[in-house]
């Protein structure tokens, strides 16, 4: 399914020689990002409905299953089928019997909005999850970050067309981009990338995201054992607390030649 459509719209603007707006009924062609409800169905039982871009949904299903703790490893999933239905898309996931039994014990239904929200959470004390503390297995040369930022920007093909999507990319320790995923929801883009990361053998490196660093972005990164998250915008206080607790290197406001290091500075050098 295509991730963008063309549509004729009305627009307004000021001309160079006047402070007045031109007529509101001028028309132009615009490109809109496609946003569609995607139902994640485990062994025939609907678990979650998320608003997504309709691409790379197998990777999304794998990443979501990992970051939500439904599975521990890709091998816990026996098969994934993407099926278009009349009002959206169903991603049909076949879990191992053991994982499906565990899921049924605390199955919940939810409707997400552009990938936001703590998925399937009913009580406040379920929000704050604890994971094993991340080991420090590498150091990253901050001088390489500028080229990574350039690569992130120029490879956001859907974002360049529509201006309506987020991107998450994975870079190795030499600053080479290994994968990039875009979606209308930043959490969904991250789940897609983490699905790729898991099925690719968990290469060492870091995630660069076009969004802010929210608590859930940090939680998903930590859950999949990635040691470093860099974002274009700021981090929230809870995201920083989560990063510090789990020894995640977290950088925000990443720009050419600068950035805020919120936690995990021992992985960085210049």
Curated annotation (Swiss-Prot):
Record-stated family: Belongs to the FdhD family.
Gene: fdhD
The keyword Cytoplasm belongs to this UniProt entry's keyword annotation: yes
GO biological process: Mo-molybdopterin cofactor biosynthetic process
Main subcellular localisation: cytoplasm
The protein's name in its UniProt record: Sulfur carrier protein FdhD
Species whose genome carries this gene: Haemophilus influenzae (strain ATCC 51907 / DSM 11121 / KW20 / Rd)
A GO-annotated cellular component: cytoplasm
UniProt GO MF annotations: sulfur carrier activity; sulfurtransferase activity
Transmembrane stretches, start-end: none
InterPro entries for this protein: Cytidine_deaminase-like, FdhD
Binding site for Mo-bis(molybdopterin guanine dinucleotide): 253-258
């Amino acid at each position: 399914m295509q991730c963008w459509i063309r549509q004729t719209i009305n627009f307004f603007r000021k001309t160079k020689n006047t402070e007045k707006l031109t007529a509101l009924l001028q028309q132009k062609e615009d490109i809109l990002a496609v946003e569609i409800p995607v139902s994640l169905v485990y062994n025939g039982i609907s678990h979650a409905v998320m608003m997504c871009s309709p691409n790379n949904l197998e990777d999304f299903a794998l990443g979501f299953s990992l970051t939500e703790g439904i599975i521990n490893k890709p091998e816990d999933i026996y098969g994934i089928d993407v099926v278009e239905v009349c009002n959206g898309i169903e991603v049909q996931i076949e879990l191992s019997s053991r994982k499906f039994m565990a899921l049924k014990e605390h199955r919940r239904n939810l409707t997400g909005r552009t990938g936001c929200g703590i998925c399937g959470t009913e009580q406040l004390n379920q929000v704050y999850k604890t994971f094993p503390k991340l080991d420090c297995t590498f150091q990253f040369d901050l001088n390489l970050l500028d080229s990574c930022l350039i690569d992130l920007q120029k490879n956001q093909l859907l974002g360049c067309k529509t201006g309506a999507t987020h991107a998450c990319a994975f870079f190795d320790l030499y600053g080479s981009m290994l994968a990039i995923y875009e979606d209308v929801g930043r959490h969904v883009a991250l789940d897609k990338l983490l699905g790729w990361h898991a099925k690719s053998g968990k290469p060492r490196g870091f995630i660069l995201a076009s969004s802010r660093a929210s608590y859930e972005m940090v939680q998903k990164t930590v859950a999949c054992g990635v040691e470093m998250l860099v974002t274009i915008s700021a981090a929230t206080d809870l995201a920083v607390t989560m990063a510090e607790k789990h020894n995640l290197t977290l950088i925000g406001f990443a720009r050419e030649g600068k950035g805020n290091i919120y936690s995990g500075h021992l992985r960085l050098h210049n």
